[in-house]
Amino acid sequence: MAQTFFFYDLETSGLNPRQDRIMQFAGQRTDMDLQPIGEPYNILVTLNDDTLPSPDALMVTGITPQKTVEEGYTEVQFARMLSEEIFTPDTIAVGFNNIRFDDEFIRHLFWRNFYDPYEWTWKDGRSRWDLLDVVRLTRALRPEGIEWPIDDKGEPSNRLELITKANGIEHENAHDALADVTALIAVTKLIKQNQPQMYDYLLKMRDKKLVQKLVNVDDKKPFVYASGRYDKEFAKTTVAFPLTTSRNGGVIVYDLRYDPTPFVDLSVEELSAKIFATWEERQAEDFVKLPVKELQYNRCPAVSPLGVLTQGDGWKKISLDAETVQKHQDILLSHPDFAERLRSIFENKPEFKKMTDPEAQLYDGFLDNSDRVRVEAVRNASERELADFHPEFQDERLSPLLLHYKARSFPNLLSEDELRQWEEWRNEHLQAQLPQFMKSLQRLAPSATDEQQFILQELQLWLESVLPSVDA
């Protein structure tokens, strides 16, 4: 099959993919020349009665829970559509900050609905690409031919709606999923037309094997790297140096913009204090950040060889020079124990607090082959078959996950005991969300416009319908 792009965007009930939900999905398939194939998708997804959406999120999107219930697909229907119609073989799934946001929501959707959460991005020629870091590196090194916006604070911004406005691209209803998809395709065309070499190179570099070839600890070489973690004043781009491997199959890299001398002799404890400092600690006047970060090979990092800086004033564009980079690299190479201490720290870094909710436990481990077969059987079972289907899962996450799956999509199949378990979980889950939900309603109400007041009223009614015992 010929490769195609599928550009997509989500509007969600909040920012946490473990507990928040997709409310709107939009997408458009294109050929490799960015010409549309077929009609766009623009659908709502029903919000279930175990979720209190973030009022702040709905102020932006304008989508109410009631609207999703009236017009939306169920999660089961939506997951099947994604699997069978959208993320088909040889599809490149493309978004704007999708690696860190949208893709995580898709993974958790698939996990809840008994689909493999990863195959849609790698199996049978499938892959993914994130245009946000492509935009960052293009702006930093090959800005010619594109107008790059400044925000209302006078600072460079890579927000999609500002890029489209600066370049005369129609983008009404920013934060409507379909409008954002249309805008993203237009911005992609802009980069492809004005900087075709950069475009082709970064498209190719979505392959993690090519990233590994450029950035590895067996043949350490400095490389150009654009990331949201880097300084805005330097176009989010620097020259980095691979130090050591990380526990998650990536590599720890050092920002060669900064002199390593203050850091190379620090103890494990002192380095750990910097790496794991809280937000409050980082705000202290005397806090000096450690310029290291993890690069994940499978997250489409925007990287390129150092040679790209020799063309078109590249060094000047990112306010660096070869002499500084070489000097700082030499210091790192003369202190190999520094890399070893970092490796130890990252390999033994504190685990996140373990989740008790099976829906939030996606990353607690991979399923074994026997459970993968059972998961497929659940997904393919008819409603009648599911009623008496009680597979003996090896993984303890899956039995409660099956109960939730049945409760949301086939509630008439629940026994009295299963219904009691579900209602207990649902009530506990809603009560945990309630304090923040109420705080947000109260904070937003005084300054809300008429349109926003309607949304807040709908949220109040939603709360009363899913938690009728609450005195609103």
Predicted features along the sequence, with ranges:
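Short hydrophobic beta-strand that contains or immediately precedes a catalytic carboxylate
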Residues: F7-D9, D255
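Short acidic, Gly/Ser-rich segments with clustered Asp/Glu that frequently serve as metal-coordination loops
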Residues: E11-R18
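Metal-dependent phosphoesterase core characteristic of DEDDh/y 3'-5' exonuclease domains
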Residues: D20-F25, R29-I63, E85-P196, L202-M205, ...
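C-terminal amphipathic alpha-helical interaction region
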Residues: L398-P400, Y405-D471
